[in-house]
Amino acid sequence: MSVVRENGVIVAIDGPSGAGKSSLTKLLAKRLGYIHIDTGAMFRAVALSAQRAGIASDDDAGLAELCRGLDITFARDGEACRVLANGEDVSREIRTEEIGLLTSTVSARQPVRQALLEMQRKMGAKGGVILEGRDIGTVVFPDAEVKFFLSASAEERGRRRYLELAARGESATLEETIAKVVQRDRQDEGREHAPLKQAEDAVPIDSTSLTIEEVLELMERTVKERLAQGDKG
C-alpha cells in the first residue's frame, strides 16, 4: 500500500523551544517544494490576540470565543513567510519573549488546542506539508509518514535565542535567556494537554553540535527515502 498522500507525505517536526525547528522547516520546505505550516506561530497569534483583547490565559470560555472569530493564515513574502491574524501581519509582534511565555500557558488550554487542531488537520490532510511544533507527531498527525524530534541542550538553545534577540535589538542577558528556555521547557513538558514528548516512531536529532546544513541534509535524505518507499508501494 502506498505511503504517499495526494500531494506527498506529511512531515512532522517536534521539539523544545529554540531547537531550530522554524529555521530548518523553512529550508526543508523550500528544498522539497512543500508547504510550511508553523503551528507555533499559530499558537503565538492566539496568545497575542488574547493579550490584546484582555482575555486571561485561563479563561477557557473567552479563549474559545476568541478562536472562533480568529482566522490565521500564512502568506509568502519572497523568502519569508508572514503570519496573518484576521488579515493583520503579526509576524514580528508574536516573536517577543513575553508572548512566547504567554503562548506556553495559552496553548495548554483545551479550547485553544481543539480549535487549532482542527485548523491544522485541514491544512495538512492532503500531504505535501511540513508542520513544526511540540505535538505534531503525537497529537495533530500521529499518522504522519515522517517524524523528527529535534533537540539541543538548554544552554545551546538559550545561546541561539540570545543571538536572535540581539539581532533584533532586544535587550537580554545570556543567563536570563537560558533561564527562560528552561522555564519554557518545564511548562511545555508538564502541561496537562498534549505535553511535549517524542513520538515513538520519530527520528531523534540532537543539533547541539551540528550545523544547520548537516541537520537539513539528514532530514531531506530521510524524507526522500520515505517518498521512494511510497513510489514502490
UniProtKB/Swiss-Prot annotation:
Chief location of this protein within or outside the cell: cytoplasm
Domain of life the protein comes from: Bacteria
UniProt-annotated location(s): Cytoplasm
One Pfam family linked to the record: Cytidylate_kin
GO molecular function, one term: ATP binding
The enzyme's E.C. designation: 2.7.4.25
Catalytic activity field: CMP + ATP = CDP + ADP; dCMP + ATP = dCDP + ADP
Tagged with keyword Cytoplasm: yes
Family designation: Belongs to the cytidylate kinase family. Type 1 subfamily.
Protein name: Cytidylate kinase
Native species: Geobacter sp. (strain M21)
Gene assigned in the entry: cmk
